[in-house]
UniProtKB/Swiss-Prot annotation:
Stretches assigned to the CN hydrolase domain: 88-337
GO-annotated molecular function: omega-amidase activity; zinc ion binding
GO cellular component: chloroplast; chloroplast stroma; plastid
Protein known as: Omega-amidase, chloroplastic
Length: 369
């Protein structure tokens, strides 16, 4: 049975038969250890003869192999593809948003042009950049993206600018209308001006923090049902929108599909932003050993929903490479994909996963086989 849920983590049932799945490895290692009391084992094991040390290393390697790391991803993880560019500049456009839609579109266009003039080959816009962020506004500002033209002036602008400037644009997100449904949708345009991918926010922002903030996107929006990964002139990119970043399974699926970079247009608020915004970006980058880029609207203290700001680029070691505060800003930062292999060689997580204990299942890829 096909499922709209794209992934799941589960424990391999064969291990439930053994309450201590490590016991067989421990018994193997004990053949090389002298009979020691618990108090003295640390000092004595430091003095093992070289032959025993070599044997332990050999067993350690054998153990790692028997952990079946290749089975920790179902289907197996794809190799990291060779990107079209090794180094390039990304532009993060942290924009102010008003109730004037025409102004918002014109303002975003100018910001994209400025980022490109400063060398950006990839430009990322914020979540809901053409509309105020509210359930009342989503139906009013929604566009029929598939119809294009006058039915979707925001995406028409993105298409024109990406083609003219020969850049890739991750178009933040806008409210999308499809029949009687509304989605929070990110459009990706290639350097030829063509729409290469469309990501509808999978995890809707429904929260209630007493005394702080309550917001229910599900009052007006419908959740998307498909993870989105796209090959572009600047590499393979996985797309999420704001709340999507909280779900590590989505990022893990993108990494297993060979993503170089994850892009999350988002609008964290003044409650969750200070605590979680940077933390989640660094976690997704570190766990999956890839780049993570985020872009927020600029803060407007007079708006009904106040964004945290702090658009950021994080490297594959979890390091913050570039960020800003809450005001309008255009960040230009370099991405170097050669670092991905360096980090993955230094910390070979893909060869150390415990496929004998857990697996990440990419339901979409599995169903397509």
């Amino acid at each position: 049975m096909k499922s709209a849920i794209s992934s799941s983590l589960f424990f391999n049932s064969k291990n439930l038969l053994n309450p201590n799945p490590l016991s067989r490895f421990i018994s193997l290692k004990s053949n090389f250890l002298p009979k020691l009391s618990p108090r003295s084992i640390t000092s004595h094991t430091l003095k093992l003869p070289s032959s025993s040390t070599s044997a332990l290393r050999s067993i350690s390697s054998s153990m790692a192999s028997s952990f079946n790391p290749e089975q920790a991803r179902v289907p197996s993880a794809l190799p990291l593809p060779a990107p079209p560019l090794t180094k390039f500049n990304i532009g993060l456009c942290q924009l102010s948003v008003t109730s004037d839609k025409k102004r918002n579109i014109s303002h975003a266009k100018k910001a994209i042009e400025e980022a490109a003039s400063k060398g950006a080959k990839l430009v990322l816009l914020p979540e809901i950049w053409n509309s105020p962020y509210s359930n009342d506004s989503f139906p009013v500002y929604a566009e029929e993206i598939d119809a294009g033209g006058d039915a979707s002036p925001s995406t028409a602008m993105l298409s024109e600018v990406s083609k003219r400037l020969k850049i890739t644009i991750i178009g933040g997100s806008i409210p999308e209308r499809v029949g009687d449904r509304l989605y929070n949708t990110c459009c990706v345009f290639g350097s030829d001006g063509e729409l290469k991918a469309k990501h509808r926010k999978i995890h809707l922002f429904d929260i209630d923090i007493p005394g702080k903030i309550t917001f229910m996107e599900s009052k007006t929006l419908t959740a998307g049902e498909t993870p989105t990964i796209v090959d572009t002139d600047v590499g393979r990119i996985g797309i999420g929108i704001c709340y999507d970043i909280r779900f590590q399974e989505l990022a893990m699926i993108y990494a297993a599909r060979g993503a170089h970079l994850l892009c999350y247009p988002g609008a964290f608020n003044m409650t969750t932003g200070p605590l979680h915004w940077e933390l989640l970006q660094r976690a997704r980058a570190t766990d999956n050993q890839l780049y993570v880029a985020t872009c927020s609207p600029a803060r407007d203290s007079g708006a009904g929903y106040t964004a945290w700001g702090h658009s950021t680029l994080v490297g594959p070691f979890g390091e913050v490479l570039a960020t800003t505060e809450h005001e309008e800003a255009i960040i230009i930062a370099e991405i170097d994909y050669s670092i991905l292999e360096q980090r993955r060689t230094s910390l070979p997580l893909n060869r150390q996963r415990r496929g004998d204990l857990y697996q990440l299942v990419d339901v979409q890829r599995l169903d397509s086989k």
